[in-house]
């Protein structure tokens, strides 16, 4: 079958149903009563949201609707100070770059942690890493925005919104985890674009969106090679930190631009 014949109607239908969802369907995700979240976390209500990007990279397609159960997620990336408490309590090895004075400030995100390190911390806290769907919903809210604050950006606002490469955002490397409040997501999360890439729970599959479940998708069930990373970092351009961008690496890899935040599922 001709590829254009298949993809053009699909794009039209994606846009059509997105419009219906936004304009006509109820939005239980914002109307539910909100339980009190644990300190430093934000409640994300259950409900549908549009995931992916119909005009983006191949692994971001198609735009599709996903339903997640309610959960709590960290308002900001795990900081060096928070990770130090984990090290002191468990004897876990210190991260790579722990002695780097440009990266180890207490209120900056911990970096140099592998996916396995991040999972160990999350389990110690009683939670886990977010799935891709949970992460994107927390960053995007209930519409098809490309950044936490919307679909547009102005060259003059980097100082207040996001930590990316080559812009006047006030930091050469990582920024404090509670910085850039103007760039918060619709739910109030900070640094969902830029600062550091964030490990997610899922194995990576470039074609997963084409076959994924509508309800609480969690990546391929079988072990893969790479784990998902989301959000971009201070070494990416503004396009590279869109909330739909997907990256990946092997779960043992540690990098100065890799950090994480945690999720606590609802009982």
Language-model features: locations:
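N-terminal secretory signal peptides that target proteins for export/translocation
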Residues: 1-10
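Bacterial N-terminal signal peptides
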Residues: 15-24
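Boundary at the C-terminal end of the N-terminal hydrophobic targeting segment
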Residues: 29-33
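A short glycine-rich, aromatic-capped structural motif
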Residues: 35-95, 113-116, 138, 193-194
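Residues embedded in well-ordered beta-strands
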Residues: 42, 65, 146, 198, ...
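Functional-site microenvironments in short loops/helix caps that host divalent-cation chemistry
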Residues: 44, 50, 54-55, 93-245
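Short, P/G- and charge-enriched loop/turn segments at secondary-structure junctions
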Residues: 58-63, 217, 246-251
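Short, structured beta-strand segments at or near domain termini in extracellular proteins/domains
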Residues: 256-267
